[in-house]
Amino acid sequence: QNFIQNDVTKVVCWYLISSFYSIEPYHNVTVMVADSPWSGHYVVNPALWAYAHYGQFAKIGWRYLDGGCTNLAEGGSLVTLASGSDFSVIAETKGAKTNQQVNFKTAGGFSGKKLCVWRSNAKEQFVRLADLTSSNGEFIVTLEPDSIYSISTTSGQTKGGFSDIPPAVAFPFPYRETFDQYTQPELFGYLPRYTADITGGFEIAARPDGKGKCLRQVISAQAQNWGPEWMPYTIIGDRDWKDYEVTADVMPDGGGWAGVMGRISGTGSGWGCNPK
C-alpha cells in the first residue's frame, strides 16, 4: 500500500527488538521480544516473517514494476519487484473475505521461469508451498484471506530457528544492587543491568562521599518531550510483585531530592498518561 498509494519504496522499523519491561508502551509490537536478560529467553513474533517476505525475495537496488502493483478486487494488494531476469511478487490479503485467483502475465526475460511460493498467516509463518511454472508467460495463484505471499524466480529462502531457547524466569528476588561490580562502567555505557530509564538519564557514577558507586541522574536540562511535567525516573523489577519492601540509600547532590516508588504498573507514553 505504501508504494501503490504514495510511491514509498522504503519503510524503517523504528525498533526491532523489545528489550524493556512489559509496563512500557509498545512492548510487544516488535519482531522479537527479549525482555528478561537474566534468563536469556526470547520470543520471535510472527511479524518477523512478514519482513522476510520482502527481505528474502528482493535486495537493495531492485525496482518496483508499475504494471505489477495493484490493489486486489476482494481486499489486499500486491507489488512486483524486479532485477535483471528475476522478479518477486509480494501479495497481502488483509481483510479479504474469500479466496482470490490472480492471473499474471509476464514478458521478455521473465517468461517460462519456475516460481517458488511462500505463505504466512496467523496460524503458520513462512511456509513453502508447491512451486509454479509459467506457461506461455502466464501463471495463476490462489490467494487465501488474511495472508502474505511471496512468489519469486529466486531461490535460497529459508526459515531459520533455534530450538534451545532458555525458558523465561521471573526477575531475581530478592534483589540488591550496589553498582560496585562495575569496575569499568564505561564498557557498559555507564548503564547498569536491568534498569530502564523512563525520563532523564541514570548512569553509574562515583558516590559523592567517595565510598563506591551509585546511580546518578545526569541530565540537568528539561527535555522537549510528550510528558513535559514528568520528573526523571528509572524502573527495575517485576510488575507481578505483590507485597514487598524497597529501600535505597539516597545522596542528594547540591540540594536535590529523590524518591522511591513501588508497584508501578504503567509508565505512560506521553499521551496524557502519568505513572500510576
Question: Where are each of the predicted segments found?
Answer:
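Extracellular/periplasmic catalytic domains that process cell-envelope and extracellular macromolecules
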Residues: 4-6, 42, 81-84, 142-143, ...
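Aromatic/acidic polysaccharide-binding cleft in carbohydrate-active enzymes
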Residues: 1-74
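Structural recognition of the beta-strand scaffold that forms the well-ordered cores
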Residues: 9-14, 88-91, 150
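Carbohydrate-binding surface patches
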Residues: 53-111
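Secretory/extracellular carbohydrate-interaction modules
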Residues: 201, 207-212, 217-276
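C-terminal beta-sandwich/jelly-roll accessory domains of carbohydrate-active enzymes
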Residues: 90-210, 221-226, 245
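Short hydrophobic/aromatic patches on beta-strands that form ligand-binding or substrate-lining surfaces
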Residues: 51, 179, 246-250
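Solvent-exposed loop/turn segments at secondary-structure junctions
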Residues: 1, 16-20, 51, 95-96, ...
